[in-house]
């Protein structure tokens, strides 16, 4: 599946949000790249909406075609479309692995999933976009549990808070999905209503 593989810090600076998490280069220069990066640009309504969509796409590592499908699904579901969209994005397996603290970044989580390190309800899943459901159980495979990424995750457990809709159990780092998240449990710096307005045109 296609994905963005360019310089993430540059993209973070362009969108004004840390897409990596703990990106020191972004923290030093949180303004757009280029000689005149600090210059103020008059924001049109469309530009603001488009930028918010791009922030969401690059935060979760989703290409445009797939992101639009997510929006269309969110729009069909009951409730607020923006809340539904974020819930869909949060339920991706790569994001759940990241949220559970088993990877430092979503990009790293995507790689771990793609390399086949996880099972969901006892079945191997190597598709990062796989959507988890309430009561799913995600395990690290036996042959992977003592590899370096998971040893590091055990050593750094607790450095980043785990959201209340997930639980990580024991040394084997089993992830329990107690529920899908409510909007208040999703801490991404997005104004999802701007995305809804963009696609509603």
From Swiss-Prot:
Signal peptide: none annotated. InterPro entries: Ribosomal_uS4 (IPR022801), Ribosomal_uS4_bac-type (IPR005709), Ribosomal_uS4_CS (IPR018079), Ribosomal_uS4_N (IPR001912), S4_RNA-bd (IPR002942), S4_RNA-bd_sf (IPR036986). SUPFAM superfamilies: Alpha-L RNA-binding motif (SSF55174). One of its GO terms (cellular component) is small ribosomal subunit. Pfam families: Ribosomal_S4 (PF00163), S4 (PF01479). Residues 91-151 form the S4 RNA-binding domain. Keywords: Ribonucleoprotein, Ribosomal protein, RNA-binding, rRNA-binding. One of its GO terms (molecular function) is structural constituent of ribosome. One of its GO terms (biological process) is translation. One of the primary rRNA binding proteins, it binds directly to 16S rRNA where it nucleates assembly of the body of the 30S subunit. HAMAP family: Ribosomal_uS4_B (MF_01306_B). Part of the 30S ribosomal subunit. Contacts protein S5. The interaction surface between S4 and S5 is involved in control of translational fidelity. Belongs to the universal ribosomal protein uS4 family. This is Small ribosomal subunit protein uS4.
């Amino acid at each position: 599946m296609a994905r963005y593989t360019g310089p993430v810090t540059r993209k973070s600076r362009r969108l004004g949000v840390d897409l990596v998490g703990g990106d020191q280069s972004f923290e030093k220069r949180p303004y757009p790249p280029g000689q005149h990066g600090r210059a103020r640009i008059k924001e049109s309504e469309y530009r603001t909406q488009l930028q918010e969509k791009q922030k969401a796409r690059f935060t979760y590592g989703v290409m445009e075609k797939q992101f639009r499908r997510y929006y269309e699904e969110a729009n069909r579901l009951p409730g607020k479309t923006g809340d539904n969209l974020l819930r869909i994005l949060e339920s991706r397996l790569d994001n759940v692995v990241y949220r559970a603290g088993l990877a430092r970044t979503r990009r790293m989580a995507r790689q771990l999933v793609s390399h086949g390190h996880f099972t969901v309800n006892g079945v191997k899943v190597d598709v990062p976009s796989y959507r988890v459901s309430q009561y799913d159980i995600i395990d690290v495979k036996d042959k992977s549990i003592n590899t370096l990424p998971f040893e590091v995750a055990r050593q750094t457990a607790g450095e980043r808070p785990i959201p209340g809709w997930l639980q990580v159990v024991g040394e084997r780092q089993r992830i329990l999905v107690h529920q899908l998240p409510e909007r208040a449990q999703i801490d991404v710096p997005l104004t999802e209503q701007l995305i809804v307005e963009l696609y509603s045109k």
